[in-house]
Amino acid sequence: MKVKICGVTHPEDAEYAALLGADYIGVIFAEKSKRKTSLSMAKSIADTTKRLGAEPVGVFVEQTTDQIIAICEQTGIKTIQLHSTFPLGALENLLRDYSIIYAISVRENGDVCHPQSLPPKVIPLYDTEKGGTGKQFNWKAFSLPKDTFWMLAGGLNPKNIEEAVATLHPNGVDVATGVEFPNKTRKDPDLLKAFILSAKKSGEKI
């Protein structure tokens, strides 16, 4: 079970998550996000993440291909997360140099908003229509992806991660709000530990 801790805003949070076994540490560059980090902070988080054997992920929403590449070159990030507004035709150019996670929106009722046919190397991440809200979609009504590595996001937290994994059998899980202090962007060490350990343990059962 791969675990991604998203919206990390401080190297200390990245360090603790990586030491606990997180595989991916997400750094957000979306302009409208409360978790957006500066380039210097993102590089510090990325350096810390790589030093501890995890993979930093740059999360982009409205940037162009050239802007994404420029940010990645300045921060040393080699894995990027894109959203459904990013044109599929531009993925192949980025795949030459970067690993890609592609967020696909799911409505509350479990329906995929805009089903996408992605290149084989791209990892689909199924999330609620507005990611980072702490809300989940209807897991039982969701049509499970077949024969592909995929990740789950949307309203996950230490209390429901075991149920989520048992119900949907994802290959990876992604959390932001569910491991944060209330009304803050910093991660809560206790919630981080509970989530990561539970996700890893749950993954061993599927």
Curated annotation (Swiss-Prot):
Alphabetical keyword list: Amino-acid biosynthesis, Aromatic amino acid biosynthesis, Isomerase, Tryptophan biosynthesis
Highest taxon in the source lineage: Bacteria
Gene Ontology biological process terms from the UniProt entry: L-tryptophan biosynthetic process
Pfam families the record matches: PRAI (PF00697)
Membrane-spanning parts: none
Uppermost EC category: isomerase
SUPFAM superfamilies per the UniProt record, alphabetical: Ribulose-phoshate binding barrel
EC assignment: 5.3.1.24
Pathway this chain belongs to: Amino-acid biosynthesis; L-tryptophan biosynthesis; L-tryptophan from chorismate: step 3/5
Cysteine pairings via disulfide bonds: none
Catalytic activity: N-(5-phospho-beta-D-ribosyl)anthranilate = 1-(2-carboxyphenylamino)-1-deoxy-D-ribulose 5-phosphate
Protein name (database record): N-(5'-phosphoribosyl)anthranilate isomerase
Annotated source species: Chlamydia caviae (strain ATCC VR-813 / DSM 19441 / 03DC25 / GPIC)
